Amino acid sequence: MVSAPSASATADTTPTPGDRSALTALLAVCGVPMMVSALVHRYTRMPEGDEPHYLVINEALKRYGSIHVRQVYDSWAFTAFHPGPLSPHVAAPPHETLPWHGIGGPLLWHVPYLLGGRTGVLLFMVAVSLLTVANVFWLVRGLGLDRRHALLTGVGIGLGSTVLTYTAKAFVEPLAALVVVYGFRVLTKARLRTRDLLLVSAALGALPWVHSRFLPLEFPLVLLLAWRIHRESGLRDRRRWLAFLGPLGVLTVALVTYLRTVWQSFNPSVNQAGDKELLFGANPVKSLVGVLLDQEHGVLFSYPIFLFVLPGVILAVAGGHRTLHLQLLAVVGPYCAILLTSPGWWGGWAPPARLWAAVLPVFAFSIGYALQRARNGLVTAWAAACVLVTMGLDTLCRFSPSNGFSADYGYLVPLRVLEGLTHRSFTGYLPAWHTRAEAPWPFLWWGLAVIAFGLVVLLSARPAARPGPVGGAPSSRTRVAA
């Protein structure tokens, strides 16, 4: 007998005409700033950080039909997108002609690159960001948020998070964010459709091609989805199992074959074998403080919309949605734990929260749940202000010499631009990991401020209409709060 999925862990995502109209409006609201950001970035800035090195892989594929990138660096064949000198990012010997970076991202956007060069890649990234926003909307709508708060949450993620920052850049973290959000959405659906299983299988199979760092995101989603299929139909439904395991298996076998043939190894991280700071070299508690409160690379000063995550989690768990959050913890927990033990948790030369951009959007339900339970004009206004802060910081980055990129500066780059415009000090009042890590007081005071904000949201929350299930029967929606 086929058992139904647990209601507290599944979602009803039956679309309605009103939902489709709301989604269209959401994509328009988010798409215009994203497109403007991408085009401004394209025509006013060279690619920074790892961006040009991903594009070098595309150029090697285009010119030579191979991924031996050394010849692109040696011949300066990258000048179409990076007119200045470019230090090679190549693997350690004996593979010094091969790329340091994963080839999955360049393979995914190679057709846009062939059609439009760097412009095509940035437009591809805008499409990825909009798909992430759309999946966030369907995720939180299916989990019971009303249409208004699902729309607000979508705007918060689309314009108030790392989604906006990285939409105009050729980094691979947005690809992982889309896969994680979509995978979690499929996991929480009331009904697993064959096409969803095919798509999520292909997406999860592509993750380690994009970067081996994303393997800790792939494994939990694969196991949780497999467990759900087994719980609902055992081993009898061969069509479901084939849909789920087929693309995943093909891409996994292809990856193993690629590693063995090209790299003479079965290690998915062989291209970064020279990296000595991957794991277990940092205190995770201290790293967590930096991730949250460091003004330069942390999350909360650049993306204050995530202040709503903790009160949202508390309210949702208290409202009976424990299974959902246990699943969320299982999906993102291993990845976060690994990053917190790495001295490189801050992500190197990049905009803020680069490595965390892969998982931040999946916390959308907690944000939306907090807003819906609060139903307070001031709380909603604060959420809108958080989005405007992120958009303002993103705009100020365009006026900085580094375009918002930093590494060990000890200050938030766009705020330094604002200081120059207003002749006022802002960065001196904020905690800075790389220059003032030994001075704990700024971290303490701002940490207390974060807790106080969470308490305000919790105290403003109205009682849930009925605690318990997030989703309902496939034919109706269950609202999570009055």
Question: Language model features by range: what are they?
Answer:
Residues 55, 63-115, 272-279, 343:
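Interfacial juxtamembrane loops and adjacent helix segments
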Residues 15, 144, 173, 183-197, ...:
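Membrane-interface transmembrane helices that cradle and orient dolichyl/undecaprenyl
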Residues 168-175, 298, 352-353:
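Short acidic/glycine- and proline-prone juxtamembrane loop motifs at membrane-interface regions
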Residues 1-41, 46, 141, 239-247, ...:
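Start-transfer (signal-anchor) and selected internal transmembrane alpha helices
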Residues 120-145, 178, 182:
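Transmembrane-helix motifs of polytopic, lipid-linked glycan transferases
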Residues 58, 153-158, 186, 196-211, ...:
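Membrane-interface alpha helices of multi-pass inner-membrane proteins
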Residues 208, 227, 240-312, 328-341, ...:
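Membrane-lumen/periplasm interface segments of specific transmembrane helices
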Residues 185-189, 216-249, 308-321, 365:
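Perimembrane helix-loop-helix junctions
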